[in-house]
Amino acid sequence: MNAWNTIYDQFNPIAFSLGSIEVHWYGLAYACAIVTAFYMALRMIQKDPKRFPIERKEFESYFLWAELGIVLGARVGYILIYEPNSSYYLTHFWQIFNPFDSNGDFVGIRGMSYHGGLVGFLIASYLYSRKDLKKLLIYLDLIAISLPLGYVFGRIGNFLNQELVGRVVPKDSHLGQIIGIMVGNELRYPSQLIEAFLEGVIVFLMVLWAKKHTKTHGLLIVVYGLGYSLMRFIAEFYREPDSQMGVYFLNLSMGQILSLLMVIVSLGILLYATKNSKKIKGNQ
């Protein structure tokens, strides 16, 4: 047993308190994710105006729509897909975003679905662009390259919050014994950090490569969608399935099933892009 294995014993998921309000590391990490994605997008607009011909004020307005769509979609998606008591929220919809418990104590909003957030993001992007659909693919591409590094902070936040834990490490896994984290009395894979690397860093490198080697609007979001789906599918083998869900056919988790659906959506966007997008002129 090494110091890393017992790291959860060394810190508290609560970063600090403001009176009766407890501020969790995840909340801070999510704020870092938003800031990172925002300024990454601004940098891309500045460095490559031919691929991203968007004014800053225009982007700021779109970013607000996109973020709102992500939050709404992520929360509603969790309620519909993962929440065992989803029927309660469907009849008490005001409770979906209620950050207080039955005693009036602030507990924050818990339970977000990445794939639900993706649906919300796509809907918000379409609604914002409906008056000028020529820019829809440009907006999607911009988010595709600015989101992954911000996503890293989100998964680190999950790790610090000691949630979405990994599967139990087999006793014969030498690497697992080294990198595993004690959760309760069991050694588990640090699946949140595995996801941060695969779904954040690796996917970013994929999209960055696509940016350098493609000249058609809409291809970056396709590469992001396909890359994320693949990396999430792999990472799910190290992540403990939600207790209320378990696994389905072929022992696939819900995350893996949704990732396969994400592949279909990405291919649909590819078809749309090939029919409606124009070549990007000039050097990138």
UniProtKB/Swiss-Prot annotation:
It is found in: Cell inner membrane. The chain crosses the membrane at residues 14-34, 62-82, 106-126, 136-156, 190-210, 218-238, 252-272. Its main location: membrane. It is an enzyme of class 2 (transferase). GO terms for biological process: lipoprotein biosynthetic process. Its EC number is 2.5.1.145. The keyword Cell membrane applies. It comes from the Bacteria. Coiled coil: none annotated. Belongs to the Lgt family. Catalyzes the transfer of the diacylglyceryl group from phosphatidylglycerol to the sulfhydryl group of the N-terminal cysteine of a prolipoprotein, the first step in the formation of mature lipoproteins. PANTHER family: PHOSPHATIDYLGLYCEROL--PROLIPOPROTEIN DIACYLGLYCERYL TRANSFERASE, PROLIPOPROTEIN DIACYLGLYCERYL TRANSFERASE. This is Phosphatidylglycerol--prolipoprotein diacylglyceryl transferase. The gene is lgt.
